[in-house]
Amino acid sequence: MATFKKFNKDKRPKRNTQSLLFKRKRFCRFTVAGVEEIDYKDVDTLRDFIAENGKIIPARLTGTRAIYQRQLNTAIKRARFLALVPYSDQHKI
């Protein structure tokens, strides 16, 4: 017959309460700036939305609205194709 162990709350890892309380509110930079379309030639803006390993950062982390996230993905892919932005961290420009 199986014996059940009692669950001890004290052994759980404690979360940092300060990080839970002070989460920064995410907002869409493009909505605030009043941008209508994201341009693939604006490399400085595109680099803010590309991770160190070359991946496109998802909207749930950046706070970008869905419309702008789709435009951002297209712009980054076009800039990669034209060699304005590297595909990965291994390709330095």
Swiss-Prot record:
Q: What are the record keywords, sorted?
A: Ribonucleoprotein, Ribosomal protein, RNA-binding, rRNA-binding
Briefly, what is this protein's role?
Binds as a heterodimer with protein bS6 to the central domain of the 16S rRNA, where it helps stabilize the platform of the 30S subunit.
The beginning of the lineage is:
Bacteria, Pseudomonadati, Pseudomonadota, Betaproteobacteria, Burkholderiales
Q: Which domain of life is it from?
A: Bacteria
Q: Which GO terms describe its cellular component?
A: cytosolic small ribosomal subunit
From the UniProt record, give one GO term of the biological process aspect: translation
Q: Which GO terms describe its molecular function?
A: small ribosomal subunit rRNA binding; structural constituent of ribosome
Q: What is this protein called?
A: Small ribosomal subunit protein bS18
Q: Does the keyword Ribonucleoprotein apply?
A: yes
Q: SUPFAM superfamilies from the xrefs?
A: Ribosomal protein S18
- State the InterPro entries in the record: Ribosomal_bS18 (IPR001648), Ribosomal_bS18_sf (IPR036870)
Quote the Pfam families the UniProt record gives.
Ribosomal_S18
Q: Which Gene3D superfamilies match?
A: Ribosomal protein S18 (4.10.640.10)
| UniProt record similarity statement | Belongs to the bacterial ribosomal protein bS18 family.
Keyword rRNA-binding appears in the UniProt entry: yes
Organism of origin is Paracidovorax citrulli (strain AAC00-1)
Q: How does it assemble?
A: Part of the 30S ribosomal subunit. Forms a tight heterodimer with protein bS6.
